[in-house]
Amino acid sequence: MPKIFRSLYVQVLIAIALGILTGFLFPSLGESLKPLGDGFIKLIKMIIAPIIFATVVSGIAHMRDTKKVGRVGGKALLYFELVTTFALVIGLVIVNILGPGRGMNIDPASLDTSGISKYTDAAGEQTVADFILHIIPDTLISAFTQGDLLQVLLVAVLFGFALLRLGKVGDTILKGIDTVNQVIFVILGFVMRLAPIGAFGAMAFTIGKYGVGSLAQLGYLMITFYATCALFIFGVLGLIARMSGFSILKLIRYIKEELLLVLGTSSSESALPRLMVKLEHAGAEKSVVGLVVPSGYSFNLDGTSIYLTMAAMFIAQATNTELSLGQQLGLLGVLLLTSKGAAGVTGSGFITLAATLSAVGDVPVAGLALILGIDRFMSEARALTNFIGNAVAALVIAKSERAVDVDRLTRALNGEDLPTIEPDVHSEERGEGRELDSLRPA
């Protein structure tokens, strides 16, 4: 096999192209390939919880300083709040300027709401108090069996601080956790060999089921949303990256394989483990990456934030529901809270949108039926923006903590070959370190 075809980047790219072609030419066949994409996502989700647990525990325990843990966590949460708020505002401003829903003149009573009932029902079942209580698992084990990232994060943080209190006994347990983490990443290497198959099945299903022609009516909203995400990535995140001393374009090139995987599966979770490896490989300390990236998947969903404000205002415009400035600010205020739980709710952004519209009451919930058909096509932009946003966040926090090898980061982003990840200062005696090549298909 030619060397170029051994690259995961090329394999996934070819798989996406073949998936689009299959779904377009053979729609029925494309729909039937859905299990390929679902199976790959399930394999990834199978190992996400243990990876996050081991990485967060290791990150906290290796810091040794509880004040540093609190400082990094505080910086991350402040960054997440500021950037996601900016994303919400940008979405609100652009949808008001361009008005993709104006002129549709749709009567909410005429919409078929049968397809959105499962989302509105799920949204109605969860209050703010329920969401907070949901973070606490019924048992330590249930957090892992249910695969809830927020619950796993809570257990991991408590476990990490507990190890700090145990002293030498904690160090012994930590060595075992680090070993388990290495085993999990070997398993990840096996799973990633199936990435092209998963991307092929997911893309074939999407095109086969929904078709390209069915997007024409709501295409303006999609174009507006994709353009807004691009503006946010290259404008806002690009400026943040530049202020922190690195290029957003070089970062995107560096994580291009992971971005293609996200594009093919429409899931930013599918590349989460590889993102952490790549950031460590680029010189960011494992302890910071292990805290910032997993928490970012619950609290730093920039693409989802843009989607929520744009979708809500699109429904209002399409149904001729006039919202005053005060009502729009009220909507924004509710979204500041509900958007932070998007990854912790089954159904993600769409249920969060339903919950928000139900809570605000100014925008007809029935209008969700308008965007149900294209939500799947908008998920790619959401996932890509979320993914890039978390990559930027990790590097920004790491640089603010001086927890990154600047020279190594520069070389990595410039495309230089750095095959072996340097071990952090706390793990040199154990010979830790993962080889990036171990995650590439042979």
Curated annotation (Swiss-Prot):
Belongs to the dicarboxylate/amino acid:cation symporter (DAACS) (TC 2.A.23) family. Residues 418-442 are annotated as: Disordered. This is C4-dicarboxylate transport protein. PROSITE patterns: NA_DICARBOXYL_SYMP_1, NA_DICARBOXYL_SYMP_2. It comes from the Bacteria. GO terms for cellular component: plasma membrane. Keywords: Cell membrane, Membrane, Symport, Transmembrane, Transmembrane helix, Transport. It comes from Deinococcus deserti (strain DSM 17065 / CIP 109153 / LMG 22923 / VCD115). The chain crosses the membrane at residues 10-30, 40-60, 77-97, 144-164, 183-203, 221-241, 331-351, 354-374. It is a multi-pass membrane protein. GO terms for molecular function: fumarate transmembrane transporter activity; malate:proton symporter activity; succinate transmembrane transporter activity. Responsible for the transport of dicarboxylates such as succinate, fumarate, and malate across the membrane. Pfam families: SDF (PF00375).
